[in-house]
Amino acid sequence: MKTFVLHIFIFALVAFASASRDSAKKIGSQYDNYETCLTEHGLTDDDIFSIGEVSSGQHKTNHEDTELHKNGCVMQCMLEKDGLMSGADYDEEKMREDYIKETGAQPGDQRIEALNACMQETKDMEDKCDKSLILVACVLAAEVVLADSSEGA
């Protein structure tokens, strides 16, 4: 069973290194709890943002706040079902471990630093849904930047 880290991400997590390159794919759609979380929140695949929209930040300008919140709730649901989040709180160590397992990142890897920065940026947010989507978006955006910088090097 795959775990979701922002899995991103990671989801969201996450969705993270290889998935971020498939921009038409829906965030989180490759993970086991995706369909369950869609059903629990009364959403369909059509309601979920694409990886490309999220990694580019277009989801923030192309969608209403209610759509952003609903997408975040699906992300939070998957993170929680995978033991990476409880309510609005991350299990940071488990999130790092699962992200490393998912991406193959090694200690000192810039992707891990990006995940840490994204968790730090969102850790004090109280709304679990908004927090989850912002975390996933942060990780996906960082992966794009890191991929672009490594291609240019």
UniProtKB/Swiss-Prot annotation:
The keyword Iron-sulfur belongs to this UniProt entry's keyword annotation: no
Function summary: Colony queen number, a major feature of social organization, is associated with worker genotype for Gp-9. Colonies are headed by either a single reproductive queen (monogyne form) or multiple queens (polygyne form). Differences in worker Gp-9 genotypes between social forms may cause differences in workers' abilities to recognize queens and regulate their numbers.
Keyword Repeat among UniProt keywords: no
Subunit structure: Homodimer.
Signal peptide limits: 1-19
Domain of life: Eukaryota
Family statement drawn from the similarity comment of this UniProt entry: Belongs to the PBP/GOBP family.
GO molecular function, one term: pheromone binding
GO annotation (BP), single: social behavior
Name of the gene this protein is made from: Gp-9
Organism: Solenopsis substituta
Subcellular localization: Secreted
UniProt protein name: Pheromone-binding protein Gp-9
Keywords: Behavior, Disulfide bond, Pheromone response, Pheromone-binding, Secreted, Signal, Transport
CC per GO annotation: extracellular space
InterPro entries: PBP/GOBP, PBP_GOBP_sf, Pheromone-bd_protein_Gp-9
